[in-house]
């Protein structure tokens, strides 16, 4: 379906809220791992049986921080989506899969407030879908990729897979 006029112009902005949410989410998770102590995350990976837990903890933190910032500013989206997707898939399979789909497991409501159980893999799938959407559709206006493509004259529009 061909979009014309205003709808076509607005479509280009679709990636911006996805980039903001996904980029911020990865940065927040990476930052939390740093603030809580990388050794704590290393211990979690070791308990899950992840090989080279210390190296993998730091690699994950670096990917979440750097990759999250890259997604946030729309830089090198197809490239940074690969390690970020790998992190999501590993988390979904090794941590969240046994708890089912739902990301919210309300166990009970007490005087102290609601008590939740472990999250399922729903959020991992949503992040994967958002990354795939940005990769396929391009990072949109107000992105490093768009600026780079326009400045270098590489692509005729955005920098998504659809533009190659």
Feature map (PLM): residue ranges:
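Membrane-interface interhelical connector segments
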Residues: 35-55
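Extended, low-polarity transmembrane helix blocks
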Residues: 1-36, 54-62, 66-69, 73-164
């Amino acid at each position: 379906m061909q979009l014309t006029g205003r709808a076509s112009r607005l479509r280009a902005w679709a990636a911006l809220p996805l980039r903001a949410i996904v980029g911020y989410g990865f940065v927040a998770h990476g930052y939390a791992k740093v603030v809580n102590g990388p050794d704590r995350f290393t211990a979690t990976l070791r308990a899950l049986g992840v090989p080279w837990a210390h190296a993998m903890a730091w690699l994950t933190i670096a990917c979440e921080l750097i990759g999250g910032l890259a997604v946030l500013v729309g830089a090198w989206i197809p490239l940074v989506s690969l390690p970020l997707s790998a992190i999501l898939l590993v988390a979904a399979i090794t941590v969240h899969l046994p708890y089912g789909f739902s990301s919210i497991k309300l166990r009970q409501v007490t005087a102290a407030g609601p008590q939740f159980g472990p999250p399922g893999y729903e959020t991992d799938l949503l992040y994967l879908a958002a990354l795939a959407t940005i990769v396929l559709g391009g990072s949109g206006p107000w992105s490093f990729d768009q600026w780079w493509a326009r400045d270098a004259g590489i692509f005729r529009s955005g920098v998504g897979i659809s533009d190659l």
